[in-house]
Amino acid sequence: MDGIKYAVVTDKSIRLLLKNQYTSNVESGSTRTEIKHWVELFFGVKVIAMNSHRLPGKGRRMRPIMGHTMHYRRMIITLQPGYSIPPLRKKRT
């Protein structure tokens, strides 16, 4: 699982869990087909849709030199009904 970095936990990503959509940051060089293959193989789920967007890096200053952090990609992965990713499953009360 070299392409998937980590799951994202924000207000929007928590709302998307109710729609069976999972959000994670991935390597910027990974393709959609690679990510889909990794998710289906590693978690044993069926992916029906994937949305992605590129987030810009942040500016960093070290005295007179202005640098920046690397940009990254975020994927929103929609699973077929009945499938879920166990570590991110919402607890029902």
UniProtKB/Swiss-Prot annotation:
GO cellular component term of the entry, any: ribosome
Keyword hit for RNA-binding: yes
Coiled-coil regions listed in the entry: none
Gene Ontology terms for molecular function: mRNA binding; rRNA binding; structural constituent of ribosome
Pfam families: Ribosomal_L23
UniProt-listed GO biological process terms: translation
Superkingdom of the source species: Eukaryota
Family: Belongs to the universal ribosomal protein uL23 family.
Subunit structure: Part of the 50S ribosomal subunit.
Protein known as: Large ribosomal subunit protein uL23cz/uL23cy
Organism: Populus alba (White poplar)
Gene coding for it: rpl23-A
